Amino acid sequence: MSKKPVVLMILDGFGLTNKVDGNAVSAANKPNLDNILKKYPHTQLGASGMDVGLPEGQMGNSEVGHLNIGAGRIVYQALTKITKSISDGDFFENVALNKAIENVKKNNSTLHLLGLLSPGGVHSHIDHLKGLIKLAKEKDIKKVYIHAFLDGRDVAPSSAKEYIEDIENYMNEIGVGEIATISGRYYAMDRDKRWERVQLCYNAIVLGKGEEANSAVEGLEKSYRDNKTDEFVLPSVVLKEGKPKAKIENKDSVVFFNFRPDRARELTRAINDKVFDGFERETLDLTYVTVTEYDSTLENVEVAFPPEHLNNTLGEYVSKNGKKQLRIAETEKYAHVTFFFNGGVEEPNEGEDRVLIPSPKVATYDMQPEMNAYEVTDKLLERLDEDKYDMVILNFANPDMVGHTGVFEAAKKAIETVDECVGKIVNKVLEKDGTAFITADHGNSEEMIDYSTGKPMTAHTTNPVPFMYVSKNSKELREGGKLADIAPTMLQLMNLPKPSEMTGNSLIK
Protein backbone atom coordinates (compact mmCIF):
# COMPACT_ATOMS: atom_id res chain seq x y z
CA MET A 1 0.00 0.00 0.00
CA SER A 2 1.26 3.47 -0.88
CA LYS A 3 2.21 5.67 2.07
CA LYS A 4 0.78 9.18 1.96
CA PRO A 5 4.00 11.13 2.41
CA VAL A 6 4.13 14.60 3.91
CA VAL A 7 6.86 16.38 1.93
CA LEU A 8 8.40 19.70 2.97
CA MET A 9 10.26 21.50 0.19
CA ILE A 10 12.49 24.31 1.42
CA LEU A 11 13.38 26.65 -1.46
CA ASP A 12 16.43 28.22 0.12
CA GLY A 13 16.53 32.02 -0.26
CA PHE A 14 13.10 32.32 -1.93
CA GLY A 15 11.45 35.35 -0.30
CA LEU A 16 8.48 37.52 -1.20
CA THR A 17 8.29 41.24 -1.92
CA ASN A 18 6.00 43.46 -3.98
CA LYS A 19 8.99 45.29 -5.42
CA VAL A 20 9.74 44.34 -9.01
CA ASP A 21 13.25 45.76 -9.51
CA GLY A 22 15.93 43.19 -8.75
CA ASN A 23 13.28 40.57 -7.99
CA ALA A 24 14.46 37.32 -9.60
CA VAL A 25 11.54 35.45 -8.01
CA SER A 26 8.90 37.55 -9.79
CA ALA A 27 10.93 37.87 -13.01
CA ALA A 28 11.44 34.12 -13.41
CA ASN A 29 9.16 32.05 -15.61
CA LYS A 30 7.71 29.65 -13.03
CA PRO A 31 4.50 28.05 -14.32
CA ASN A 32 4.38 25.35 -11.64
CA LEU A 33 4.64 27.64 -8.63
CA ASP A 34 2.26 30.16 -10.25
CA ASN A 35 -0.26 27.39 -10.79
CA ILE A 36 0.08 26.19 -7.18
CA LEU A 37 -0.54 29.73 -5.93
CA LYS A 38 -3.71 29.92 -8.05
CA LYS A 39 -5.07 26.51 -7.06
CA TYR A 40 -3.99 25.83 -3.48
CA PRO A 41 -4.05 27.57 -0.07
CA HIS A 42 -0.99 29.65 0.75
CA THR A 43 0.18 32.20 3.28
CA GLN A 44 3.32 34.13 4.23
CA LEU A 45 5.60 33.40 7.17
CA GLY A 46 7.96 35.58 9.17
CA ALA A 47 11.54 34.31 8.71
CA SER A 48 13.65 37.08 10.25
CA GLY A 49 14.09 39.07 13.45
CA MET A 50 12.21 38.06 16.56
CA ASP A 51 10.13 35.55 14.56
CA VAL A 52 13.21 33.31 14.46
CA GLY A 53 14.94 34.34 17.70
CA LEU A 54 17.16 37.02 16.14
CA PRO A 55 17.32 40.71 17.05
CA GLU A 56 14.51 42.81 15.57
CA GLY A 57 15.23 43.72 11.94
CA GLN A 58 17.98 41.10 11.57
CA MET A 59 17.73 39.14 8.32
CA GLY A 60 17.21 35.40 8.59
CA ASN A 61 19.66 32.79 7.37
CA SER A 62 19.74 29.10 6.51
CA GLU A 63 21.01 27.81 9.84
CA VAL A 64 18.48 29.79 11.84
CA GLY A 65 15.66 29.00 9.42
CA HIS A 66 16.20 25.24 9.51
CA LEU A 67 16.62 25.24 13.30
CA ASN A 68 13.29 27.02 13.76
CA ILE A 69 11.47 24.86 11.21
CA GLY A 70 12.82 21.63 12.71
CA ALA A 71 12.28 22.67 16.33
CA GLY A 72 8.69 23.83 15.95
CA ARG A 73 9.47 26.66 18.37
CA ILE A 74 11.38 29.94 18.26
CA VAL A 75 15.03 29.10 18.92
CA TYR A 76 16.91 32.03 20.39
CA GLN A 77 20.06 32.34 18.37
CA ALA A 78 23.67 32.61 19.45
CA LEU A 79 23.71 36.19 18.15
CA THR A 80 20.90 37.21 20.49
CA LYS A 81 22.32 35.17 23.37
CA ILE A 82 25.88 36.56 23.12
CA THR A 83 24.73 40.16 22.63
CA LYS A 84 22.57 39.82 25.73
CA SER A 85 25.45 38.36 27.76
CA ILE A 86 27.67 41.34 26.81
CA SER A 87 25.00 43.83 27.89
CA ASP A 88 24.31 41.87 31.12
CA GLY A 89 28.04 41.64 31.89
CA ASP A 90 28.06 37.81 32.13
CA PHE A 91 30.26 37.72 29.03
CA PHE A 92 33.21 39.12 30.98
CA GLU A 93 33.00 36.29 33.52
CA ASN A 94 32.67 33.56 30.87
CA VAL A 95 34.78 30.57 31.94
CA ALA A 96 36.10 29.59 28.48
CA LEU A 97 36.97 33.17 27.51
CA ASN A 98 38.78 33.66 30.81
CA LYS A 99 40.82 30.49 30.19
CA ALA A 100 42.17 32.19 27.06
CA ILE A 101 42.98 35.29 29.13
CA GLU A 102 44.69 33.30 31.93
CA ASN A 103 46.83 31.38 29.42
CA VAL A 104 48.11 34.65 27.92
CA LYS A 105 48.91 36.03 31.37
CA LYS A 106 50.68 32.85 32.48
CA ASN A 107 52.85 32.61 29.35
CA ASN A 108 53.18 36.32 28.58
CA SER A 109 51.86 35.36 25.15
CA THR A 110 49.43 36.83 22.60
CA LEU A 111 45.64 36.85 22.33
CA HIS A 112 44.45 36.35 18.73
CA LEU A 113 40.85 37.18 17.84
CA LEU A 114 39.68 35.53 14.60
CA GLY A 115 36.42 36.04 12.79
CA LEU A 116 34.24 37.77 10.25
CA LEU A 117 34.50 41.54 10.68
CA SER A 118 30.90 42.44 9.89
CA PRO A 119 27.62 43.58 11.42
CA GLY A 120 25.91 41.02 9.13
CA GLY A 121 24.83 38.89 12.08
CA VAL A 122 24.80 35.68 10.06
CA HIS A 123 28.20 34.27 11.05
CA SER A 124 29.39 36.88 13.52
CA HIS A 125 28.79 40.38 14.79
CA ILE A 126 31.32 43.19 15.10
CA ASP A 127 29.88 44.06 18.53
CA HIS A 128 31.00 40.66 19.85
CA LEU A 129 34.56 41.46 18.73
CA LYS A 130 34.29 44.76 20.60
CA GLY A 131 33.17 42.76 23.66
CA LEU A 132 36.31 40.61 23.39
CA ILE A 133 38.58 43.65 23.03
CA LYS A 134 36.90 45.20 26.08
CA LEU A 135 37.43 41.95 28.01
CA ALA A 136 41.15 41.98 27.09
CA LYS A 137 41.42 45.61 28.24
CA GLU A 138 39.64 44.89 31.54
CA LYS A 139 41.97 41.95 32.20
CA ASP A 140 45.01 44.06 31.30
CA ILE A 141 46.11 42.01 28.27
CA LYS A 142 48.56 44.00 26.16
CA LYS A 143 49.19 41.85 23.06
CA VAL A 144 45.86 41.55 21.24
CA TYR A 145 45.71 40.99 17.48
CA ILE A 146 42.74 40.73 15.15
CA HIS A 147 42.71 38.43 12.13
CA ALA A 148 39.85 40.03 10.26
CA PHE A 149 37.88 38.04 7.71
CA LEU A 150 36.08 40.29 5.25
CA ASP A 151 32.46 39.72 4.37
CA GLY A 152 30.92 41.29 1.25
CA ARG A 153 28.20 38.70 1.22
CA ASP A 154 25.92 39.25 4.22
CA VAL A 155 26.64 42.97 3.80
CA ALA A 156 27.44 45.11 0.73
CA PRO A 157 30.23 43.62 -1.46
CA SER A 158 32.69 46.49 -0.88
CA SER A 159 31.87 47.73 2.60
CA ALA A 160 34.83 46.38 4.60
CA LYS A 161 36.61 49.73 4.94
CA GLU A 162 33.81 51.04 7.13
CA TYR A 163 34.10 48.07 9.51
CA ILE A 164 37.92 48.12 9.57
CA GLU A 165 37.84 51.82 10.49
CA ASP A 166 35.09 51.21 13.05
CA ILE A 167 37.10 48.51 14.88
CA GLU A 168 40.37 50.45 14.60
CA ASN A 169 38.71 53.53 16.11
CA TYR A 170 37.33 51.36 18.91
CA MET A 171 40.76 49.84 19.62
CA ASN A 172 42.42 53.28 19.61
CA GLU A 173 39.78 54.60 21.98
CA ILE A 174 40.09 51.68 24.39
CA GLY A 175 43.88 51.46 24.06
CA VAL A 176 44.41 47.84 23.05
CA GLY A 177 44.37 45.72 19.89
CA GLU A 178 45.64 45.90 16.29
CA ILE A 179 44.69 44.21 13.02
CA ALA A 180 47.39 41.68 12.04
CA THR A 181 45.86 40.11 8.92
CA ILE A 182 42.90 40.49 6.59
CA SER A 183 41.40 37.77 4.45
CA GLY A 184 38.31 37.43 2.28
CA ARG A 185 35.82 34.92 3.64
CA TYR A 186 36.21 32.94 0.41
CA TYR A 187 39.56 31.78 1.84
CA ALA A 188 39.03 31.95 5.60
CA MET A 189 35.54 30.47 5.71
CA ASP A 190 35.36 27.70 3.14
CA ARG A 191 33.09 24.78 4.03
CA ASP A 192 33.65 22.50 1.04
CA LYS A 193 37.10 21.07 1.87
CA ARG A 194 38.80 23.35 -0.61
CA TRP A 195 41.93 23.20 1.49
CA GLU A 196 43.97 25.19 -1.04
CA ARG A 197 41.85 28.23 -0.11
CA VAL A 198 42.05 27.63 3.63
CA GLN A 199 45.80 27.16 3.39
CA LEU A 200 46.30 30.68 2.04
CA CYS A 201 44.49 32.08 5.08
CA TYR A 202 46.41 29.75 7.42
CA ASN A 203 49.71 30.87 5.86
CA ALA A 204 48.88 34.51 6.61
CA ILE A 205 47.78 34.10 10.22
CA VAL A 206 50.18 31.35 11.34
CA LEU A 207 53.22 31.79 9.08
CA GLY A 208 52.95 35.51 8.34
CA LYS A 209 53.08 34.79 4.61
CA GLY A 210 50.79 36.23 1.94
CA GLU A 211 50.05 39.56 0.31
CA GLU A 212 51.66 42.39 2.27
CA ALA A 213 50.46 45.84 3.32
CA ASN A 214 51.34 48.49 5.89
CA SER A 215 47.76 48.69 7.15
CA ALA A 216 44.51 46.79 6.82
CA VAL A 217 42.95 49.57 4.74
CA GLU A 218 45.98 49.66 2.43
CA GLY A 219 45.64 45.89 1.88
CA LEU A 220 41.95 46.28 1.15
CA GLU A 221 42.46 49.13 -1.32
CA LYS A 222 45.14 47.14 -3.14
CA SER A 223 42.60 44.35 -3.51
CA TYR A 224 39.95 46.75 -4.85
CA ARG A 225 42.44 47.94 -7.47
CA ASP A 226 42.72 44.28 -8.56
CA ASN A 227 38.90 44.22 -8.85
CA LYS A 228 38.50 41.90 -5.87
CA THR A 229 35.60 42.71 -3.54
CA ASP A 230 35.69 42.00 0.20
CA GLU A 231 34.74 38.33 -0.01
CA PHE A 232 37.66 37.61 -2.36
CA VAL A 233 40.46 39.66 -0.75
CA LEU A 234 43.60 37.52 -0.83
CA PRO A 235 44.92 36.73 2.66
CA SER A 236 47.16 39.68 3.51
CA VAL A 237 49.66 40.28 6.30
CA VAL A 238 49.91 43.72 7.92
CA LEU A 239 53.55 44.70 8.40
CA LYS A 240 55.23 46.71 11.14
CA GLU A 241 58.77 47.81 10.32
CA GLY A 242 58.82 45.32 7.45
CA LYS A 243 57.77 42.31 9.55
CA PRO A 244 54.35 40.70 10.15
CA LYS A 245 52.67 42.37 13.14
CA ALA A 246 51.73 39.02 14.65
CA LYS A 247 51.54 35.31 13.90
CA ILE A 248 49.84 32.59 15.92
CA GLU A 249 52.58 30.84 17.89
CA ASN A 250 52.91 28.17 20.58
CA LYS A 251 51.37 29.09 23.96
CA ASP A 252 49.17 31.80 22.40
CA SER A 253 45.41 31.98 22.93
CA VAL A 254 42.98 32.06 20.03
CA VAL A 255 39.33 33.08 20.21
CA PHE A 256 37.30 32.44 17.05
CA PHE A 257 34.29 34.73 17.44
CA ASN A 258 32.13 33.42 14.57
CA PHE A 259 29.05 31.91 16.20
CA ARG A 260 27.82 30.02 13.15
CA PRO A 261 29.73 26.74 12.95
CA ASP A 262 29.66 25.57 9.35
CA ARG A 263 32.19 28.03 7.92
CA ALA A 264 34.44 28.13 10.99
CA ARG A 265 35.23 24.41 11.24
CA GLU A 266 37.84 24.03 8.51
CA LEU A 267 40.15 26.83 9.62
CA THR A 268 39.78 25.69 13.24
CA ARG A 269 40.86 22.19 12.24
CA ALA A 270 43.78 23.55 10.22
CA ILE A 271 45.07 25.63 13.13
CA ASN A 272 44.23 23.44 16.09
CA ASP A 273 43.75 19.74 15.25
CA LYS A 274 46.60 17.50 16.39
CA VAL A 275 46.04 15.20 13.40
CA PHE A 276 45.20 17.00 10.17
CA ASP A 277 45.49 15.95 6.53
CA GLY A 278 44.14 18.98 4.64
CA PHE A 279 47.67 20.22 3.95
CA GLU A 280 51.09 19.97 5.57
CA ARG A 281 51.63 22.08 8.66
CA GLU A 282 53.19 22.03 12.13
CA THR A 283 51.12 21.24 15.22
CA LEU A 284 50.68 24.15 17.63
CA ASP A 285 50.17 24.17 21.39
CA LEU A 286 47.36 26.70 21.90
CA THR A 287 44.49 27.60 24.16
CA TYR A 288 41.74 27.64 21.54
CA VAL A 289 38.26 28.99 22.26
CA THR A 290 35.28 28.98 19.92
CA VAL A 291 32.28 31.09 20.95
CA THR A 292 29.86 28.26 20.06
CA GLU A 293 30.36 24.55 19.44
CA TYR A 294 31.61 24.14 15.87
CA ASP A 295 31.71 20.35 15.90
CA SER A 296 31.42 17.96 18.84
CA THR A 297 34.41 15.97 17.49
CA LEU A 298 36.85 18.91 17.71
CA GLU A 299 39.51 18.23 20.33
CA ASN A 300 41.40 20.70 22.55
CA VAL A 301 38.74 23.38 22.14
CA GLU A 302 37.00 25.40 24.84
CA VAL A 303 33.43 26.46 23.98
CA ALA A 304 32.24 29.78 25.41
CA PHE A 305 28.52 29.27 24.73
CA PRO A 306 27.79 25.52 24.52
CA PRO A 307 24.64 24.36 22.73
CA GLU A 308 21.36 23.99 24.57
CA HIS A 309 19.72 20.68 23.83
CA LEU A 310 16.40 20.86 21.98
CA ASN A 311 14.11 17.96 22.89
CA ASN A 312 11.38 16.67 20.60
CA THR A 313 12.40 18.33 17.36
CA LEU A 314 10.20 17.33 14.43
CA GLY A 315 12.60 14.59 13.30
CA GLU A 316 13.07 13.13 16.78
CA TYR A 317 9.36 13.18 17.59
CA VAL A 318 8.30 11.61 14.28
CA SER A 319 10.96 8.93 14.82
CA LYS A 320 9.70 8.19 18.37
CA ASN A 321 6.29 7.64 16.84
CA GLY A 322 7.63 4.92 14.58
CA LYS A 323 7.54 6.93 11.35
CA LYS A 324 10.13 6.79 8.58
CA GLN A 325 11.68 9.97 7.19
CA LEU A 326 14.04 11.08 4.44
CA ARG A 327 16.35 14.11 4.31
CA ILE A 328 17.74 15.12 0.93
CA ALA A 329 19.84 18.05 -0.34
CA GLU A 330 23.03 18.84 -2.19
CA THR A 331 26.28 19.51 -0.29
CA GLU A 332 25.77 23.25 0.21
CA LYS A 333 22.59 22.69 2.25
CA TYR A 334 23.01 19.11 3.46
CA ALA A 335 24.01 20.20 6.98
CA HIS A 336 20.89 22.34 7.09
CA VAL A 337 18.38 19.54 6.43
CA THR A 338 20.22 17.20 8.84
CA PHE A 339 22.30 18.77 11.64
CA PHE A 340 20.47 22.11 11.91
CA PHE A 341 17.01 20.69 11.26
CA ASN A 342 17.64 18.21 14.08
CA GLY A 343 18.46 21.00 16.53
CA GLY A 344 22.23 20.76 16.19
CA VAL A 345 22.42 16.97 16.50
CA GLU A 346 24.67 15.14 14.02
CA GLU A 347 23.34 11.59 14.56
CA PRO A 348 20.34 10.62 12.41
CA ASN A 349 17.15 9.64 14.24
CA GLU A 350 15.99 6.04 14.03
CA GLY A 351 14.22 5.56 10.71
CA GLU A 352 15.83 8.69 9.23
CA ASP A 353 17.54 8.13 5.87
CA ARG A 354 19.76 10.76 4.29
CA VAL A 355 20.71 11.42 0.69
CA LEU A 356 23.56 13.79 -0.15
CA ILE A 357 24.03 14.93 -3.74
CA PRO A 358 27.45 16.59 -4.24
CA SER A 359 27.26 20.27 -5.25
CA PRO A 360 28.96 21.09 -8.56
CA LYS A 361 32.60 22.15 -8.29
CA VAL A 362 32.42 25.59 -9.87
CA ALA A 363 34.09 28.76 -8.61
CA THR A 364 30.76 30.59 -8.24
CA TYR A 365 27.26 29.24 -8.79
CA ASP A 366 26.20 31.81 -11.40
CA MET A 367 28.27 29.59 -13.73
CA GLN A 368 25.87 26.71 -13.07
CA PRO A 369 22.64 28.17 -11.65
CA GLU A 370 20.80 24.85 -11.91
CA MET A 371 23.44 23.46 -9.50
CA ASN A 372 22.44 19.82 -8.92
CA ALA A 373 18.71 20.37 -8.43
CA TYR A 374 17.79 17.92 -11.20
CA GLU A 375 19.84 15.14 -9.56
CA VAL A 376 18.22 15.89 -6.18
CA THR A 377 14.79 15.68 -7.83
CA ASP A 378 15.47 12.43 -9.70
CA LYS A 379 16.78 10.80 -6.54
CA LEU A 380 13.77 11.97 -4.53
CA LEU A 381 11.30 10.68 -7.13
CA GLU A 382 13.02 7.27 -6.96
CA ARG A 383 12.79 7.28 -3.16
CA LEU A 384 9.12 8.30 -3.17
CA ASP A 385 8.38 5.32 -5.40
CA GLU A 386 9.73 3.04 -2.66
CA ASP A 387 6.64 3.99 -0.59
CA LYS A 388 8.78 3.87 2.52
CA TYR A 389 8.62 7.38 3.95
CA ASP A 390 6.00 9.15 6.04
CA MET A 391 7.90 12.45 5.95
CA VAL A 392 10.43 13.99 3.57
CA ILE A 393 12.51 17.14 4.14
CA LEU A 394 14.12 18.52 0.98
CA ASN A 395 16.20 21.62 0.31
CA PHE A 396 16.83 23.29 -3.03
CA ALA A 397 19.93 25.47 -2.60
CA ASN A 398 19.65 27.42 -5.87
CA PRO A 399 17.72 30.63 -5.02
CA ASP A 400 20.11 31.28 -2.13
CA MET A 401 23.47 30.17 -3.47
CA VAL A 402 22.94 31.81 -6.87
CA GLY A 403 21.31 34.86 -5.24
CA HIS A 404 24.56 35.34 -3.29
CA THR A 405 26.48 35.87 -6.54
CA GLY A 406 24.46 39.02 -7.27
CA VAL A 407 24.06 37.91 -10.91
CA PHE A 408 20.39 38.57 -11.68
CA GLU A 409 19.99 36.46 -14.84
CA ALA A 410 21.62 33.49 -13.13
CA ALA A 411 19.29 33.82 -10.14
CA LYS A 412 16.32 33.88 -12.51
CA LYS A 413 17.57 30.67 -14.09
CA ALA A 414 18.02 29.19 -10.61
CA ILE A 415 14.35 29.89 -9.78
CA GLU A 416 13.22 28.47 -13.12
CA THR A 417 15.17 25.28 -12.46
CA VAL A 418 13.62 24.90 -9.02
CA ASP A 419 10.14 25.55 -10.44
CA GLU A 420 10.60 22.70 -12.90
CA CYS A 421 11.72 20.40 -10.08
CA VAL A 422 8.88 21.44 -7.76
CA GLY A 423 6.39 20.61 -10.53
CA LYS A 424 7.72 17.05 -10.88
CA ILE A 425 7.76 16.44 -7.13
CA VAL A 426 4.26 17.85 -6.55
CA ASN A 427 2.86 15.58 -9.28
CA LYS A 428 4.48 12.55 -7.67
CA VAL A 429 3.26 13.48 -4.17
CA LEU A 430 -0.32 13.99 -5.42
CA GLU A 431 -0.12 10.67 -7.26
CA LYS A 432 0.69 9.10 -3.85
CA ASP A 433 -2.24 10.98 -2.28
CA GLY A 434 0.32 12.77 -0.12
CA THR A 435 0.81 16.39 0.91
CA ALA A 436 3.47 18.83 -0.26
CA PHE A 437 4.31 21.95 1.72
CA ILE A 438 6.48 24.49 -0.09
CA THR A 439 8.30 27.16 1.88
CA ALA A 440 11.67 28.89 2.32
CA ASP A 441 14.04 29.48 5.22
CA HIS A 442 14.70 33.17 4.44
CA GLY A 443 14.70 35.59 1.52
CA ASN A 444 17.52 36.43 -0.89
CA SER A 445 16.88 36.24 -4.64
CA GLU A 446 13.67 38.30 -4.50
CA GLU A 447 15.74 41.40 -3.67
CA MET A 448 19.00 41.54 -5.59
CA ILE A 449 19.31 45.31 -5.75
CA ASP A 450 20.20 47.53 -2.84
CA TYR A 451 17.37 50.03 -3.29
CA SER A 452 19.31 52.81 -1.56
CA THR A 453 22.37 52.57 -3.84
CA GLY A 454 21.10 50.72 -6.94
CA LYS A 455 24.04 48.31 -6.65
CA PRO A 456 23.75 44.50 -6.60
CA MET A 457 22.71 43.09 -3.24
CA THR A 458 24.15 39.69 -2.35
CA ALA A 459 22.83 39.40 1.21
CA HIS A 460 19.75 37.74 2.67
CA THR A 461 16.65 39.84 3.30
CA THR A 462 14.08 40.42 6.04
CA ASN A 463 11.19 39.64 3.69
CA PRO A 464 8.56 37.02 4.52
CA VAL A 465 8.61 33.62 2.83
CA PRO A 466 5.80 31.62 1.19
CA PHE A 467 4.02 28.64 2.69
CA MET A 468 1.97 26.64 0.18
CA TYR A 469 -0.23 23.67 1.05
CA VAL A 470 -0.70 21.22 -1.82
CA SER A 471 -2.93 18.19 -1.39
CA LYS A 472 -6.15 16.76 -2.80
CA ASN A 473 -8.05 18.15 0.18
CA SER A 474 -6.11 21.24 1.27
CA LYS A 475 -7.68 23.37 3.99
CA GLU A 476 -7.42 27.12 4.50
CA LEU A 477 -4.35 28.58 6.16
CA ARG A 478 -4.18 31.37 8.71
CA GLU A 479 -2.13 34.55 8.42
CA GLY A 480 0.54 35.80 10.82
CA GLY A 481 2.60 32.62 10.96
CA LYS A 482 6.32 32.08 11.37
CA LEU A 483 8.78 29.28 10.56
CA ALA A 484 8.21 27.65 13.98
CA ASP A 485 4.60 26.94 12.94
CA ILE A 486 5.56 24.56 10.10
CA ALA A 487 6.37 21.48 12.24
CA PRO A 488 3.05 21.59 14.17
CA THR A 489 1.26 21.89 10.80
CA MET A 490 3.04 18.80 9.47
CA LEU A 491 2.27 16.85 12.65
CA GLN A 492 -1.41 17.69 12.28
CA LEU A 493 -1.34 16.16 8.79
CA MET A 494 0.39 13.07 10.19
CA ASN A 495 -2.27 12.76 12.93
CA LEU A 496 0.32 13.19 15.67
CA PRO A 497 -0.38 15.40 18.70
CA LYS A 498 2.05 18.30 19.09
CA PRO A 499 4.65 17.69 21.84
CA SER A 500 4.65 20.18 24.73
CA GLU A 501 8.12 21.49 23.76
CA MET A 502 6.79 22.83 20.46
CA THR A 503 5.39 26.30 21.02
CA GLY A 504 4.60 26.89 17.34
CA ASN A 505 0.99 26.45 16.22
CA SER A 506 -0.51 24.76 13.18
CA LEU A 507 -1.13 27.07 10.23
CA ILE A 508 -4.27 25.17 9.22
CA LYS A 509 -7.40 27.10 10.16
Swiss-Prot record:
Known cofactor(s): Mn(2+)
State the Gene Ontology terms under molecular function. Answer: manganese ion binding; phosphoglycerate mutase activity
Name of the featured protein: 2,3-bisphosphoglycerate-independent phosphoglycerate mutase
Q: Spell out the catalytic residues.
A: S62
Residues that, per the record, bind substrate: H123, R153, D154, R185, R191, R260, P261, D262, R263, K333
Among InterPro entries, the record links this protein to: Alkaline_phosphatase_core_sf (IPR017850), BPG-indep_PGM_N (IPR011258), Metalloenzyme (IPR006124), PGAM_B_sf (IPR036646), Pgm_bpd_ind (IPR005995)
Gene name in the database record: gpmI
Recorded family membership: Belongs to the BPG-independent phosphoglycerate mutase family.
